[in-house]
């Protein structure tokens, strides 16, 4: 919770968000941001291990899971575990950021424009990776994007907002075929040119 909501309630695991201890809530949530926030003085392995260490995971389990996840995203553990963030490309940094967000099996993954600064090839690769990881780990993912092609590719359901208000929540197919109003229709028409 960065900002308290002004109206209504948001529930997570049948409990109102405002009733959670903030630390408990944060440890159940993974974050991937547009600005890749790796700690520059920590190795790839140390960056990935931060949350599991806070949750008192076994050291051996952390190492094994880190190596396994690195392999899953195409980063050979032998070559990447001990590298510093400055030695990685933008796409590699974002992969590490994603792994750090999911290694402790969060219930919710929040992704805020995570691919907007990447080249087109890295962007497509990471979109595919997110779909694969989402299906494998079965976590709820809240993905913020202004890229309608990206939303259509990645989302099970899309929430369209206008001036902070919900205009429509629907599957990508329903949004395309039956937009709630002209704003939604134009929004998706512009995104699909």
What do these predicted ranges mean?
Residues 45-53, 63, 67:
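Short helical segment in ABC ATPase nucleotide-binding domains corresponding to the A-loop/adjacent helical element
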Residues 105:
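Conserved catalytic motifs of ABC-family nucleotide-binding domains
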Residues 169-170, 178:
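ABC ATPase "signature
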Residues 8-16, 25:
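Conserved ABC transporter NBD signature motif
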Residues 83-88, 92:
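Conserved ABC ATPase signature
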Residues 109-112:
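Catalytic Walker B motif of ABC-type/P-loop ATPase nucleotide-binding domains
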């Amino acid at each position: 919770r960065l900002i308290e909501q002004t109206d209504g309630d948001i529930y997570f695991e049948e409990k109102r968000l405002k009733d959670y201890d903030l630390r408990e809530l944060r440890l159940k949530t993974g974050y991937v941001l547009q600005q890749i926030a790796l700690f520059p003085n920590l190795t790839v392995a140390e960056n990935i291990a931060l949350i599991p260490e806070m949750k008192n995971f076994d050291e051996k389990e952390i190492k094994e899971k880190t190596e396994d996840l690195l392999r899953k995203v195409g980063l050979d553990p032998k070559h990447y575990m001990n590298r510093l963030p400055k030695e990685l490309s933008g796409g590699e940094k974002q992969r590490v950021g994603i792994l750090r967000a999911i290694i402790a099996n969060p219930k919710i993954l929040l992704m805020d424009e995570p691919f907007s600064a990447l080249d087109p090839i890295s962007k497509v690769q990471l979109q595919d990776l997110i779909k694969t990881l989402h299906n494998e780990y079965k976590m709820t993912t809240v993905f913020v994007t202004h890229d309608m092609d990206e939303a259509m590719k990645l989302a099970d359901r899309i929430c369209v907002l206008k001036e902070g208000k919900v205009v429509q929540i629907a599957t990508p197919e329903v949004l395309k075929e039956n937009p709630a109003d002209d704003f939604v229709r134009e929004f998706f028409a512009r995104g699909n040119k």
